[in-house]
Amino acid sequence: MVAIKPFKPLDEKFPFDRQLGIAAAPLVLINLFTVVDPADEAGFLDAFKAAAEVITKQPGFISMQLHRAIGDSPTYLNYVMWDSTEAVRAAFNDSDFLAKLPAYPSSVVASPHLFQKVAVPGFCTA
């Protein structure tokens, strides 16, 4: 899988490529993007839109929401719901998606990680 460079795992001991090898369903992809150079913010949003146009058409895609940190923080959080890790693997290896990645500005750091819901009785359902 090609990643936006520089690529920084959220958990060094359990990187994204390893997560993609685990069968799980449904799941959420959280991708933290840090736009190190503020001048690259518009370019980041343009590249994100182009990649999202491909991702949102992939089998197994459920929904997506991009959030920007408040204040002057250069951090974005992308929350994507998928029906399975198999769907995420296929989408991230799609040639049309991979072709969009070089458009991300070089100062953008991506940190993807996969999650599943956890049940907490009385508060959260899984």
Predicted segments with their positions:
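Short, surface-exposed ligand-recognition loops at beta-strand->loop->(often short) alpha-helix junctions
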Residues: 34-46
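Short, low-order "capping/linker" segments at domain edges
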Residues: 117-126
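An amphipathic, aromatic/His-enriched active-site/gating alpha helix that lines ligand/cofactor pockets
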Residues: 1-16, 20, 53-62, 81-116
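Short amphipathic alpha-helical/adjacent loop interface patches that line ligand
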Residues: 48, 52
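Conserved beta-strand termini and adjacent loop/short-helix elements that scaffold enzyme active sites
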Residues: 67-69, 115-118
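Short, well-ordered beta-strand segments in beta-rich or mixed alpha/beta enzyme
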Residues: 26-35, 65-94
